[in-house]
Structures are given as C-alpha cells and as structure tokens.
Amino acid sequence: MEQKYIVAIEIGSSKIKGAIGSIDETGTLTVLAVEEEKVLDSVRYGCIQNVDMVCNAVSQVVSRLEQDPGIAPRKIKSVYVSVGGRSLSSVIVNESTTLPDETEITEYIIEQIKYKVKTTAIADRDVIDVVPCKYFVDKQMVPNPVGVFGQTLTAKMNLIVCKPQIKRNINRVLCERLPFAIAGYIVRPVAIADIVLTDNEKRLGCMFVDFGAETTTESIYKDAVLQYIATLPMGSRNITRDITATNCIEEKAEEFKIAHGSAIADGSAKKTTADGV
C-alpha cells in the first residue's frame, strides 16, 4: 500500500510553520519534518497583511520540507492551513428538520443538517467549521442521535467563523502566488485543545487559553463539547515590547523573554541582570 503524506501550514503573527507527516495503513500519523520561518509585521493579529513577504516565507518553509531526506524527491501539492486570528469567534445556530413518522436517524441525515448550517449566511463572516453541541429527537436531548427513531431532529451547532479577509489572503498566497491546493482549514485553538485537554476536562468543563504572539484565544468546553470561542487582540509580543522599553531592540527582548520568562509564578522573587540594560 502506497504511503500517504499530509502537510500543514500555520501562518502566525511571528512565524510561518510547516509540518509534514506520513500516514500508514492503520491510520497512524508520524511527523517527519517541521520547519519555520520568522516574519515581522507581514502578519498582524493572525491576518496576512503583506502577501509578497508571506509568500516568500511559505515558499522557503515548503522548500526545506521537500528537501528533507524522508520526503525528497516528492513535491508538495496540497496543504492543510491553520486558521486563527483576532476575528476568530463562535456563533450558536439551531437547525431543525422534520422526518417521516418513526424515521431512523442516520449519519447522512446528520451530515445534511451540518451542511445546511455551514452554508448559513453570517454577516461579514466566513464559516470555517461546524461543531455540534447538542441534539434533540422529538424534543428529548440525546448524546448521539444516530440509530434513534423519531419525527423531529433539532441540532444546536457552534459555527466557528472569521472575517473573509483571513481566508481570502491565505488563498492569494497558497493558490494564486504559489502552486498549492488547500486541502482544508483547521481551527488552530480547537486542534491544540484536542491534543492538550483530556476527555474528563472537556466533560467537567474548562477554559483553554491559546497564547499567541499578537492574539489570545479562549475556548470554553462543557459536557465534552466546545461551547464558545473568543479572541483578544493581545499576546506574548505585548510582553516583548514592554521589555524594549529598557532600550533594547525587539529581537533581543524576545530572546531575553524566552530565556528568563516564566508563565507560572513560583511565589519567590528573582532578580536578573542583563548586560547592557
């Protein structure tokens, strides 16, 4: 059986990251290579501002991935793209359908509802993903409606949305300037939460915070599903720029932050001296 490969690109405010992995016959994914390229001011708050600069950075990342011994001489043709940014948020939509008497609900019926919800017009927003929250069959809540018989099915869906400019500029970079097809969009905070959070944490309820360079995304989980997403226009670069007030350039401030900073307070005061500050 021919091995399958999957490529993902993340276009962040501080760097462009790319990863390629192989999928074996059991569906197991093995990461083969990861590359990144720093960007400065060409992506702001998760939205591409300078298409040419981002195009060059993505091209370099992909070129290095293709040169990896585990990949060469294969060429990358399509990629999955991570989506985040200041405009990322969620909208709750309820959709109902009436079925013939005593109809067994199937995956096909569920997918029809999801498709209808995904094509819902949201003012000044593009729908990236649809996350089911709750299902009701004949007004009774059921965790999984597949296999249940009923006459009415109501779905409470969480639409993950962003400004059209996000996807439009991604398309300009990857499909118009570069020779790639977009295999799909991945909601970055949701993908990270699926890796970090346990099933119990999602079921009992928690808030997951994705702290980026210029944005911070908060995701609320309850009853094992995503309930809410909101994004704040601030991130780790705010800390870096505070450090530049000590009369050092941003690159040095970033290095100092990474070397000496900690997100977890240990209760003890520490004094650090940096040369030239």
What are the functions of these language-model segments?
Residues 204-245:
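Glycine-rich phosphate-binding loop of actin/hexokinase-like ATP-binding domains
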Residues 241, 251-255:
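Glycine-rich nucleotide-phosphate-binding loops and adjacent flexible coil segments
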Residues 1-15, 19-207, 225-227, 236, ...:
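Nucleotide/phosphate-binding catalytic cleft detector across ATP-hydrolyzing
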